[in-house]
Amino acid sequence: MGRPGRLGQCGGGGDVSFSVEGDYFEVCNCEVSCNCIWLGAATNDNCDLLLAWHVTSGNKDGVDLSGLNAVMAVHSPKRMTDGGWKVALYLDDRASAEQSEALGAVFSGGAGGHLAGLAPLIGEVAGVAPASITFEKTGGSLHAEVAGALSMSSDQLVGMDGQEPGVITNAPLSAVAQPMRQARAKDVSYHGHWSADFSGTNSFVTDFRYQG
């Protein structure tokens, strides 16, 4: 992984223009439903959170990012709002140098937008590096892998009508601004800069959109 530093510095700063959208899901070791998004305490002594994005369309400063993936691993204290998060960012190794720089700027928060609001909570960047990333979506099931480091899966949970998943909106602490569909994580394993293994825990799924 790359040299530790401030995540918001990835990809540079200054005036930027970007708009990206696509598929997103996250898994964590909290019980369903995660209390962290409501500024409460995690189920365990810490929150191990893994986030995966697949860009279906979008660009930064004219650099096309369609079809590329990014994954972030987060290790936070029991209350995420206390800050001091340890994070690692993985960028799709299929990207060109120009695309990788743009991808890193967008998903680190360095380009501004929604993710920039989480930057003050980060205490340590364990690394930022290219990786072979797989992102798959089949109906209400999603799966992502970072070769040699991470595997995560999620199944959406059906709501009261027996057909559609439950939806959470307007949570005060979230990596996305869009309504999130409730899901359950399964067979999650991360062995990168730290280790975390869990299953049957919380997951959220949505169609993300960032711009700045």
Language model feature labels by segment:
Residues 1-15:
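Short, Lys/Arg-enriched N-terminal segments with co-localized hydrophobic residues
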Residues 16-60:
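N-terminal ordered "arm"
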Residues 39-46, 78-83, 127-145, 182-185:
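Short, surface-exposed loop and linker segments with low hydrophobicity and enrichment for Pro/Ser/Thr
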Residues 45-115:
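Aromatic- and glycine-enriched beta-alpha-beta binding-site module
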Residues 62-69, 89, 123-129, 171-173, ...:
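Low-complexity, flexible helical/coil segments
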Residues 85, 89-167:
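Charged linear interaction tracts used for macromolecular binding and regulation
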